[in-house]
Amino acid sequence: MDSVERIQKGEEYIGVALGSEHGVDPISNTTAYHLVSSAEECIVIVLHNHPSLSDFSLSDVQFLLRYASVKMMVVVTNLGNISYLVKGKGYAYEKAVALFNEAVSSNNEAQDLKGLQKAADHFLKNCCMVGIDYDNR
């Protein structure tokens, strides 16, 4: 049975997409793409490091918002910190996109790495207002 059949039957299945030195695209692998695009619900775990040692970047958040099937995103940093973003029962897509756009505007005005992190932090500090739970351990 191939991956598409297993996904369609709702069986548990894992797709792995490897990144490069400068980025990671969780759906760059065919199997991972099929999982995200055809599953009713899925969890994406991203293992990567950001230069600032931050957890979620705006690119990570954009991925979470883009795919309705992704209900949880987990980031494990190079220092072993684990952070979660979970779409809760009160998740409001339109409000989440508006909050994301606020963060992107701040990001576009950033002059340095600290400014870029501040933009991502803006989303993370306010995401509970749009039904997304954030936890960092």
Report each predicted region and the residues it spans.
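Short beta-strand scaffold segments in enzyme catalytic cores
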Residues: M1-V16, M73-V76
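Serine/threonine-rich low-complexity intrinsically disordered regions
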Residues: D2, S28, V36-S38, S52, ...
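Short amphipathic beta-strand/extended segments with alternating polar/hydrophobic composition
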Residues: G10-N29, S83-K89, A98
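Short HxH-centered metal-ligating active-site micro-motif
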Residues: L18-S69
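Divalent-metal-activated hydrolytic enzyme cores
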Residues: S69-R137
